[in-house]
Amino acid sequence: MLRAVSRAVSRAAVRCAWRSGPSVARPLAMSRSPAPRAVSGAPLRPGTVLGTMEMGRRMDASASAATVRAFLERGLNELDTAFMYCDGQSESILGSLGLGLGSGDCTVKIATKANPWDGKSLKPDSVRSQLETSLKRLQCPRVDLFYLHAPDHGTPIVETLQACQQLHQEGKFVELGLSNYASWEVAEIYTLCKSNGWILPTVYQGMYNATTRQVETELLPCLRYFGLRFYAYNPLAGGLLTGKYRYEDKDGKQPEGRFFGNSWSETYRNRFWKEHHFEAIALVEKALKTTYGTSAPSMTSAALRWMYHHSQLQGTRGDAVILGMSSLEQLEQNLAATEEGPLEPAVVEAFNQAWNVVAHECPNYFR
């Protein structure tokens, strides 16, 4: 079964490549995901990246392959994983799909990350070990985008960056990315890389959604100044912005998900599971009903439309939203929402009011 699904995924990738035109040898610069075209002079919307954190956990290999196929068949082509996702199963599943990741003529782009957790570090040996292990799992010679997943405050950053430069020179990754770093750390890293002639970071992956906007104050201006594009994770606040939860649910038995039943559950509950967040969601839900009546979009749709049309993401700068999922149905619903138009002004204002309700306890974007 998996073999058949894998072949289907590979065929989808070929069709995607065909739509993109003949294959050509690429220089050492990453091809970005095709962003949605502007309609009638509207601003270019942010791109969409497939987040694969649940592959190997809530999604088995067959279900994972089906979601990748559905994603590619929409003409999208960037996949995001990490060394640590599901103890490496996410990378292994992606590597088993026969996509030809990392080859010169592959139009499907892959990103992974090295982290400083669970006995790992960002010391040179650990960075190399993590990346080379990821390449083996992904069955590819190089990744298109290699992130430092979070700061390692016990390792001098210059050592980490030197290691990244060496790995880049060896052809093991194309672009360097940062995630969960403070804005001052981004400035320090960029300056160090530039002064030493090392590969410059070009992408930052950070937490951003309609009720988690801390990045707007300092980080986004920093990224604009240094020319990094921004990829937003947690666009639905781990699922809280779907509106399917109630604050009292934390005290009862819940099905497995971001907030319950896994090693990251406590982190996500500490991040988003707060009374003010539920009050903020109620404000938006009321505005949706008042504004749209019986044709009101779902809370999920509204939250994603806010990201694509009303946030500070800019498609012209190559910004993107990372869409995760725990099923094919969920992915298809989320992708449909990304193609919908802007929200009515009253709902946008309700989202602003919601942000004001939770701003005082917004989780930090850095670690």
From Swiss-Prot:
Transit peptide: 1-46
Positions where Phosphoserine occurs in the chain: S40, S263
Enzyme Commission code: 1.1.1.n11
Keywords: Acetylation, Cytoplasm, Golgi apparatus, Lipid metabolism, Mitochondrion, NADP, Oxidoreductase, Phosphoprotein, Transit peptide
Region (Disordered): 27-46
Residues modified to N6-succinyllysine: K244
PANTHER family assigned to the protein according to its UniProt record, in alphabetical order: NAD(P)-LINKED OXIDOREDUCTASE SUPERFAMILY PROTEIN, NADH-SPECIFIC METHYLGLYOXAL REDUCTASE-RELATED
Similarity comment text for this entry: Belongs to the aldo/keto reductase family. Aldo/keto reductase 2 subfamily.
Extra information: With 4-nitrobenzaldehyde as substrate, it exhibits a substantially greater specific activity with NADPH than with NADH. Conversely, it has a 1.8-fold higher activity towards succinic semialdehyde with NADH than with NADPH.
Gene Ontology annotations of biological process type: daunorubicin metabolic process; doxorubicin metabolic process; lipid metabolic process
InterPro entries, A to Z: AKR_Detox_Biosynth, NADP_OxRdtase_dom, NADP_OxRdtase_dom_sf
Top-level taxon of origin: Eukaryota
Binding-site list for NADP(+): 80, 179-180, 205, 234-244, 258, 326-334
Keyword Membrane: no
Residue list for modification N6-acetyllysine: K136
Annotated substrate binding sites: H149, Y268, R271, R367
Site (Lowers pKa of active site Tyr): K113
Description of how the protein assembles with itself and partners: Homodimer. Heterodimer with AKR7A1.
The protein, known as: Aflatoxin B1 aldehyde reductase member 2
Subcellular location: Mitochondrion; Golgi apparatus, Golgi stack; Cytoplasm
A single Gene Ontology CC term: mitochondrion
Species of origin: Rattus norvegicus
Function of the molecule: Catalyzes the NADPH-dependent reduction of succinic semialdehyde to gamma-hydroxybutyrate. May have an important role in producing the neuromodulator gamma-hydroxybutyrate (GHB). Has broad substrate specificity. Can reduce the dialdehyde protein-binding form of aflatoxin B1 (AFB1) to the non-binding AFB1 dialcohol. Acts as a 2-carboxybenzaldehyde reductase.
GO molecular function: aldo-keto reductase (NADPH) activity; aldose reductase (NADPH) activity; phenanthrene-9,10-epoxide hydrolase activity
UniProt-annotated catalytic positions: Y85 (proton donor)
Keyword Nuclease assigned: no
